Design a protein with these regions (language model features):
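Conserved Radical SAM active-site core
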Residues: 2-107, 111-119, 128-140
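Active-site glycine- and acidic-residue-rich loops that bind
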Residues: 86-89, 153-162
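Residues that form generic nucleotide/phosphate-binding pockets
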Residues: 31, 35, 98, 120, ...
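Conserved strand-turn element in the central/C-terminal portion of the radical SAM core barrel
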Residues: 113-115, 121-124, 137-157, 181-183, ...
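Residue-level detector of anion-binding/catalytic polar loops
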Residues: 78, 144, 174
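Auxiliary Fe-S-binding modules of radical SAM enzymes
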Residues: 159-238
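Conserved aromatic-histidine-acidic binding/catalytic patches
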Residues: 20, 57-60, 80, 123, ...
Length: 238
């Protein structure tokens, strides 16, 4: 995940610290309420959340996402949700209420239907089949549902995109997005170790395909390009 590097700004590592040391802003709901009370705020949609999973296991204890959604609902603040976990179903009642006011949409991240690959790429996340059930249940409850496919990795999971989109649409998803893998900062070294450990027979091929999609590098920081790549490989994924 490109977001791993954010942990380094807090003095932690992008490796195990990202997975094990969770930073909690316990007064998030109070801060959001204060922000929304600003008369100059124009109710531009906000996102939960681009750099973490707002329904990660810690949410069961802290309920920050629930409290933030309650504030958004109170102020009729439009919000989008991105998650890899079925924990979002806990808040179905609230999301259904927000859906009636057309102020919420949710994206479920699906990267593969290959369970072995999913466990290696995203341990402790919900299975693809469970995610499809989440899409179906929430869409039937009036929540606008979509999917995020990311990261798409050439030579590993990019060939599944059409199948994922079809399955998601069959379960009620109405929009889709994707991100092409980018190995920024420390993630370059973490991914390299993971790739060659788990896929020694074709790791070189995957690595070179990524390089071909980022102008000979494995990362591109240019806005508008970094998340989609460029060149023939990236175009085939798109």
């Amino acid at each position: 995940c490109y977001a791993r590097n954010v942990h380094e700004y807090w003095g932690y590592s992008a490796g195990l610290d990202f997975e094990q040391k969770i930073i909690v802003k316990k007064n998030a709901a109070q801060l959001l309420r204060k922000f929304l009370l600003n008369p100059k705020w124009d109710a531009t949609p906000i996102m939960l959340s681009g750099n973490t999973d707002c329904y990660q296991p810690a949410e069961k204890k802290f309920r920050l996402t629930r409290s933030l959604l309650e504030v958004c609902n109170e102020f009729n603040q439009p919000v989008g949700i991105l998650t890899k976990n079925s924990g979002i179903l806990r808040d179905k009642d609230l999301l259904q209420e927000m859906g009636k006011k057309n102020i919420v949409s949710a994206m479920v991240s699906i990267t593969s239907f290959n369970e072995e690959l999913r466990r290696m790429m995203e341990p402790r996340t919900t299975t693809a089949k469970q995610k499809l059930k989440v899409i179906e249940e929430l869409s039937k409850s009036g929540v606008r549902m979509g999917i995020m496919m990311g990261p798409m990795i050439p030579g590993l999971n990019e060939h599944e995109m059409q199948r994922i989109m079809k399955a998601a649409a069959d379960h009620g998803a109405t929009f889709t997005a994707y991100t092409f893998i980018r190995l920024n900062g420390a993630i370059k070294f973490l991914f390299h170790d993971w790739l060659y450990k788990n896929f020694p027979n074709h790791a070189d091929k995957v690595w070179h395909l990524i390089e071909q999609s980022h102008d000979g590098k494995v990362n591109d920081s240019r806005w508008g390009v970094r998340m989609r790549g460029e060149g023939s490989i990236a175009q085939m994924v798109a």
